[in-house]
Amino acid sequence: MPRRTLDTVWWPFVQHGLVNDEGDVNVIDSAWGDHFAVFNGHKSPSPPSATPLSVVPGAGSLMECQFDGSASWWTQSLGHAHPALTLAAARAAGRYGHVMYPQATHEPALRLAERLVHDGPGKGWASRAFISDNGSTGMEIALKMALRVASKRFGIAPQERKKIGVLGLRGSYHGDTIGAMDACEEGVYTCEWHRAKGYWFEPPSIGIKNGRTFVKIPSAVAHNKNIEEGQPLSWIYDVSARLDTPLASAYRNHVNDSLEKLTSGAGATQLGALVLEPLVLGAGGMIFVDPLFQRVLIDAARARGLPVIFDEVFVGLWRLGMRTPSSLLGAYPDVSVYAKVLTGGLVPLAVTLASEDVFRAFEGTSKAEALLHGHSYSAYPVGCQVANAALDLYERLVRGEAWKAAKAAWGTDGVGGKEEGDRADTDTTGVWSVWSPQFIDVLSKLDVIEQAMTLGTVLAFKLKGGEMEIGAVFFPLCPFLAPARES
């Protein structure tokens, strides 16, 4: 298999000129829980392994267990081959196969849309769910939605609409399709057709060093680059309490001055939306953005009539210990996008949520006015059924004792959010991590660590060296479900 793969396959995100040896090809036989069963290429005793795999390789085995360190590119939240997800996929495949979705409905898609809009991250602001296939596509849809709203709201002439730009943050990444790339700066992920459309602020970032939390402020905002060094993590994420601080004023002045220069005079930029990855820039380097700065950006965008898009493909659905960052930021978007852990990592699926105002911007008497975006497998039953099963497991997980205990270690009581009762224990205004505060404190004091940071299931750290290197670890959620899995 390795030789045949090297001769035939074109991998994503791989420089093939650097892969010349068959030993560099990872042959995965199967996967279970958080591990792969991998062909080791030789008959020799495999090292001891404490994994959930039912068959542990012994002497002379060709297989060995390998930890899925990337969580299969950030999608695995419940472990490989989770029985509930596998059965959900089989059930939908046997009942539906694939059926068309335009002007039709089926139970898995309807249930998914209703729970995300009415009882999920869209509660309180969203009215519609547009189901697609992956995060990049979901962001393309979000951009089309928001820019249509802006075009109508500002009366932008049709010939000028192709010039509309977006506001965002440097280091953002929204996918590999052309429109999603154009919503970002020029970078390693862009291509020959890329045309950056917009303006991107340098984001203030949060880190922990020697047990102390600091906010690294860009020089364009303030000369003192660590204005709030030493503040507790709970204070940094208490956005409402920080809105009247000197730093908030500095952020507002910087944002408003920049926008005034950008949108006035000759060569002014027509802006159409604010596009944010809330709290953490994932592919851009696991940058934990100061939430106060993002809130100031949101407020400034709202004041100028710009629709707000939250790209929650990476951060949404409890990755950061909360259902959605909206509860922490104290602000809702007009459009938001969910993918990756939406299906527990089993199959691809994305959902773009939109407010009623956004939906109404596409109403009319001709088809040309509709949102003409879709693909053959839009809202395919297998994906929707698996997503519902994954969400069922998440709802159970966040009410479990292990989840509450992890929160309690960080001083969060586990009952938060604005609506207690049906949403109790799902949203929280407190910040916490599955890694203990003591572990983070020790990690941040190591000589080899430049800084560390954690939130929810994400732990990121920078290593000292010639160039800054970043490591990221994603804690699997399946251990929180272990008792339920046995029942």
Residue ranges, per PLM feature:
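Conserved N-terminal phosphate-binding loop of PLP-dependent enzymes in the Aspartate aminotransferase
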Residues: 1-487
